[in-house]
């Protein structure tokens, strides 16, 4: 069966081909202290990744019905085929009889051993910025530094799904689908001005921004409801349904902002700063935020610093308008889940996130050691996140139908972006650096430690307990790195040790365990052939430290592999990844 790879399902990073990135940066001296500049980038890559394996005797909506019996299509057009309605998947003689009956059809005829879809895509990113900077020479604004610029950025993700079916099309389904595209376009215009008045520095400016999120529909076969949808077959390219014309469109928003920033050297030892920013959105949102900060030189070698600020993050146009259908795990079972704008399910329109933060720290020079230590606390209210998957209620189905969602009655699970919970994150960052001469060269040693603790202060109405646990425990509280960077005349090298503390590991957004701490080591050596050309060889996780293995809990089908984990060996949320050791060879050329 060519529809099934060996192994049937692969966990890990996708295949990336034709990965190309180009940057440029240029400037032109215009005289009198002014400069024109341009910079930009372009990148493109093809991605090919695996999806969940479709079991030929168990995948609902494809091979079986909701009651577990085999899903059989009557292809006569008038339901006169007298096809079996309660055939057990283990009855292979009955299956073969169905295959031999021209009035009946099962997808096993096209994929007798099941199949594993391949999710493919082409990703392009591009941006371009041009501007002019300098200092105003005459008039009432003489001595004012300026920077005026405009930029445009574009990201396009074109999706496809291969080696799958639109089950509702039965024997007429193609196997490969073009499912559509997302395009994000951003345009900005900035004017930034600043001037010093004795011990006081003043900065102010204006920003205009327009963002457009576009959904391009896929080919018809990727989203259409075929003739067998009414018999229980899933609609659309199975695994990631195409974007229909009903969900396609361009969704734009404009906003402008003005800001002011004042800093004053109150005394030789004390610097204070205050900033204010007002932002207005065409969607009707507006906000005013501020920042207060200080730096106090306690002694020649020790300084204290601190800040307090408020923040605001409006929902993106993508979050507010995204529509897609894909396969996901719900309570350990594969199912089709659709992501919809919340208002199409009768939920409230998305509102902005608001945050308040505090930070306090110390900067010290202790002989040849530079040390910084900062405590921080961040409270975020009305956080924007996807809800857990759940079967739509009758009221939600009615809202979906009223909003024009096609085949609403066939959608098994839904989720949507919503403002539903609040969090409080606090922690400590400590960084120490030391420079010396060792082994006939210059040596930089650095150590960094981070402690971060996140608490869900208000769970809201739709955020599940399991999601709260992932938010609070899904990342290590303790992280640390130690780096040794060595430089000789033509050779440089570094060794870095990475420490990850205990965390709550989750597999496929379904179940988890408390994972042990671990350490990885990265190394790299670079040789400068000349002033322009260099080559590097290195490794990430050189000792091949494994991620946390899935434990042998109830329902285990083998050592370290519980039931229904779809071939996974490691918990996929490991902070160090599940790929193991990665070696690389690279070359660089500086123009």
Give the residues covered by each predicted segment.
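Gram-negative outer-membrane beta-barrel transporters
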Residues: 376-508, 586, 590
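Outer-membrane beta-barrel proteins
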Residues: 1-31, 47-51, 104-125, 172-188, ...
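C-terminal beta-signal and adjacent terminal beta-strands/loops
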Residues: 380, 499-505, 526-591
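Transmembrane beta-strands of outer-membrane beta-barrel pores
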Residues: 20, 42-46, 136, 152-156, ...
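Transmembrane beta-barrel wall of Gram-negative outer-membrane proteins
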Residues: 1-113, 117-135, 140-141, 528
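Outer-membrane beta-barrel signature, preferentially recognizing the C-terminal barrel domain
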Residues: 239, 243-255, 301, 311-379, ...
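Repeated loop/turn-to-beta-strand initiation elements of outer-membrane beta-barrel proteins
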Residues: 33-36, 139-146, 199-202, 269-272, ...
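Outer-membrane beta-barrel transmembrane domain signature of Gram-negative proteins
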Residues: 117-123, 127-128, 137, 150-152, ...
